[in-house]
Amino acid sequence: MAASVDRQYHPAPMSGVVRTPFSNHHRSDSPVRNGYTFSNPPSSNGVVKPGEKIKLVDNNSNSNNGSNNNNNRYDSDSEEDDDENEMNVWNEMIKKGNSELEPSSVDSRDEGTADQWIERNPSMIRLTGKHPFNSEPPLTRLMHHGFLTPVPLHYVRNHGPVPNAKWEDWTVEVTGLVKRPIRFTMDQLVNDFQSREFPVTLVCAGNRRKEQNMTKQSIGFNWGSAAVSTSVWRGVPLRDVLKRCGVMSSLKGALNVCFEGAEDLPGGGGSKYGTSVKREFAMDPARDIILAYMQNGEKLSPDHGYPVRMIIPGFIGGRMVKWLKRIIVTTTESDNYYHYKDNRVLPSHVDAELANSEAWWYKQEYIINELNVNSVITSPCHEEILPINAWTTQRPYTMRGYAYSGGGRKVTRVEVTMDGGDTWDICELDHQERGSKYGKFWCWCFWSLEVEVLDLLGAKEIGVRAWDESLNTQPEKLIWNVMGMMNNCWFRVKTNVCKPHKGEIGIVFEHPTQPGNKSGGWMARERHLEISDSGPTLKRTASTPFMNTTSKMYSMSEVKKHNTADSAWIVVHGNVYNATRFLKDHPGGSDSILINAGTDCTEEFDAIHSDKAKRLLEDFRIGELISTGYTSDSSSPGNSVHGGSVYSGLAGLAPITEAVPLRNVALNPRVKIPCKLIEKVSLSHDVRRFRFGLPSEDQVLGLPVGKHIFLCANVDDKLCMRAYTPSSTIDVVGYFDLVVKVYFKDVHPRFPNGGVMSQHLDSLSLGSIVDVKGPLGHIEYLGKGNFTVHGKPKFAKKLAMISGGTGITPIYQVMQAILKDPEDKTEMHVVYANRTEEDILLREELDKWADEFRDRVKVWYVVEKAEEGWKYDTGFISEKILRDHVPAVGDDVLALTCGPPPMIQFAVQPNLDKMGFDIKEQLLIF
C-alpha cells in the first residue's frame, strides 16, 4: 500500500496526528542514574517554587556509605547507556513540547477565587465552570505532542481550591501501624532516599464520561476523551518510605495504606481528600508506586500536587492523592468521604437515590483501582473534512489514535471496523516504552491504520477497540453507571458527506461528543432524534451517504438574534428551542428565560431542571445548532453565555437591553458576577446571615423589589443554582445580605442529604467567591401599592402576605421597600408559618416593624409545635386564621405568598378561594 500523506483539510491548525518520533528504548523501572541529587538542596536559604527546573549532580564519585542508599543498580555498561539515552530522548521531547506552548497566565475567570494566583494554559477546556479547576486539553493538541504531555496541557482534576504550599514548610507524616512514625520534610524525601524517574500515563476514571451523560445523566461532569496524559515522574518509592518507618506485617493488622491530602473540601460535611490501597500493592516493587515531587524535569506545578503527590502506575487518577500530607497504615481501608462516594462503578440499575438509601457506596466489590482497556480515534478529528477528488482518492488515509490499559498490562492489539463490527482491520502499534524489568507497561501507546478513501466514503461510521495481554477488550455498547466512570465502549466516529467548497464534496467526521458543555457530536443529535415524534425514520445506504437534512440547522449568530420576548430562542445540548410560546406558562416567570434568550444555557438548564422539565423541552425544539467549522459562523467563548434557567419572557415584555445605568449597578442579566463572602453571622443553630461584597465598592446590586437572584456554585463538581431574595435594602452600596436557613444532612427524614446549596454556603470561608446572576422573577413592586406581574399592572391598598419558612424573604423585601417610603401608605397583614418558634426567620425585624407601624403592619405567626406560653396560633394555616388576620377580599386587596409548594397548594389557595379571592388575578405567587 502506498505511503500515507498528510493531505486532509483541518478546520483547526493542529490535526490529530501523533508527531512524536518513535522510540522503543524506554524502561519504566530505571532509577535516577547513579543516584542524582539536587546540586543545591532546598533549604531555609532559598524558596523552592512550583515548576522550578532541577539541576542534577552525579554522585558516582561519592563513597557508598549507605547514608543516601544510592547504590549503583546497573549490571552492565550497555544498560546504563540505554538509560542515559532514554533520558536524553525524554529531555528532547519535553524541551520541544514546551517550546511550542503559548505562555501560561492567570485566567480572568480565576480572579476573585482561591486559585487567582495560579498561572494556567489558556487552551485548557474548563469542565466545571469557574471553580474548582477541572480541565482537559483539546484532543488535537494533546495528540500533537505525542508520547509526553507538556505539564500545562496535562489534564487537571481538582475537588476544591489548590493549596498555596511552600517547600520549606511542607511535611509528610507517616503514622498508624508503623514502628517508627516519622514526619518527613521535603528535603529529607529528596536527599534521604534513592529516587526513581519514569514515564506514567495518568487517566481519570471519568475519561469519556460525556458519552455516558448523553445516554443518561450521571452525577459527574462532562469529561471528553482527553482526560489522559503522560509525564515523566520522579519521586521516592513508597515501599522504601514505609520500610524506613518500620511498617508492621499483615499478621499484625497492617492491611491498608491510606493517603490524605491537604485541601479543605465540602464533602461529608468537610474533609480532606483521602483514599487507600492495599498493603500488598504498596509494598510490591513491581507496582512502582512513588511519592512524586518532579514532573517532566521540573518541580510539580500547583495543579498537579506541589510539592508532593502519589503516583500509582496503572491505577485511576483518583487514587493518586495530590498535596500529600499524611500516610496512615491501617487495618481497614480509608474511611474518607471521597474514598466511598467517588470512584465506583455501581450496577446500571442503581441511581444516586438508591445508592444512598441502600448503601451501595460501601460495597467493596464496586471500587475502582486499575484502569480498564480503552482506545480512542484521534484522527480523523472532530469536524475534520476530507475532500474527495482525483488526488485524495489515489492515496490512503491514515487513521490514528491512542490506547491504554491498567495494571501494567500491555496493549497487544488495536482493531478498526468500518462496517459495524462485521470485519476488523489490525492496526500498527507504536509502544514508546520497553516495559519494566517486571514486564509492566505503564504508558499509553499509539495506533495507526491506512485505509482507502473510497472505503471511508461508503462507511456509516468508524469504530475502534483495543485488546491487552490478558485478552481484555472493549464492549460494543456503552454500560451506564451512576458515576459515569470507566466508559470504554467502542469509540465511534460518524461520517457524512458535505460540500466544503463550491463544486466540491468531502467527508466530514463527527466524534460522539465534545468535552464540557460544548455543543457538537453525533450523540447529542441522535439522542434528540430518537425521542422526537416528528420527522421520518432516517435511513442510509453505503451508496447514498448524506448529512442529516430532516432537522433544520441554525448557526449561533442566528440564535443570538432571537433574544426578546417576541422571539426567545435558547440552545441546550446542541439543540435549538423556540421558547416564546412558553413564556407566559413558565413557573419561574418570563425573566428566567429572557436572561438566557439567544444563548447556550445548557449548564444552567441542567442545574435547575428535573427530568420532567427536560422532556417538556422537546415540544419546543426547532432544530440543531451548527457546530461544524465549514458551515457555522465562528464564535468565541464570549459569544455563548452559560447561564440561567431555560425560558424567559412574556409577549408583552420589552426585550432585555444593555442600557447605560443611571447608577453603577452590579447585576447584568447576561453575565454571572463574582461576589466575595465578606461576613458570616450565625443567627441560630441553623440560620446564617451571609454578606457578599459586590465586584466594586461603589455598586448597588440593582435588584428590583420583588425579584430574586440566582446563586451559582460548583458543589461536588456539578453546577448548583438556587434562587434567593436578599434581606438588605435595594439601595445599599457595595454588598448584599442573604439570610439563609441551613438544611443539614440527616436532620429531615425526607431529605437525608440536606440542602446542597445551604450546606455549601455554610461551609464557605471568608473570601470565598460565589457567582450571582439576575434579576429574575415575574413580580416587581414599583411603590405606593403598584405591582407589575408578568408585565401587567396591578394595584392594592392592602396586602395579605402569607409566607412559610424561608419564603419570608421576598415578603420581607416588599415590606422593607414600603416602609422605607414615607409616602407609601400600603397596609401589610403578614401570616407567617413555621415548624417551630426557633425556625422563624427575621422575627426581630418583623416584630419591630409591627410595633413601630401599628396602623399598617400586622404580623401573626403559626407554628406546628409550640412551647408553653405561645400567644399565636399552632397547627397549619387555615381558613379561620386567614379570616382573622388578613384583609377581606376587595378590589383594593392583593394576596402575596411564598413558601413550600404544599402550603400554597393545600392551604393558601383553597382557603383564599373560600374567602372569595380571585386566585388567578388577586394571588401573586413569588
Swiss-Prot record:
Cited Pfam families: Cyt-b5, FAD_binding_6, Mo-co_dimer, NAD_binding_1, Oxidored_molyb
Biased composition (Low complexity): 58-73
Binding site for Mo-molybdopterin: 204
Record's protein name: Nitrate reductase [NADH]
Role noted for this protein: Nitrate reductase is a key enzyme involved in the first step of nitrate assimilation in plants, fungi and bacteria.
Catalytic activity: nitrite + NAD(+) + H2O = nitrate + NADH + H(+)
Domain Cytochrome b5 heme-binding, residue spans: 551-626
Upper classification of the organism: Eukaryota, Viridiplantae, Streptophyta, Embryophyta, Tracheophyta
Family: Belongs to the nitrate reductase family.
Cofactor note: Binds 1 FAD per subunit.
SMART domains: Cyt-b5
Subunit structure: Homodimer.
GO BP terms in the entry: nitrate assimilation; nitric oxide biosynthetic process; sulfur compound metabolic process
SUPFAM superfamilies per record: Cytochrome b5-like heme/steroid binding domain, E set domains, Ferredoxin reductase-like, C-terminal NADP-linked domain, Oxidoreductase molybdopterin-binding domain, Riboflavin synthase domain-like
Record-listed E.C. numbers: 1.7.1.1
Residues annotated as binding FAD: 722-725, 739-744, 751, 756-758, 809
GO molecular-function term, one example from the UniProt record: nitrate reductase (NADH) activity
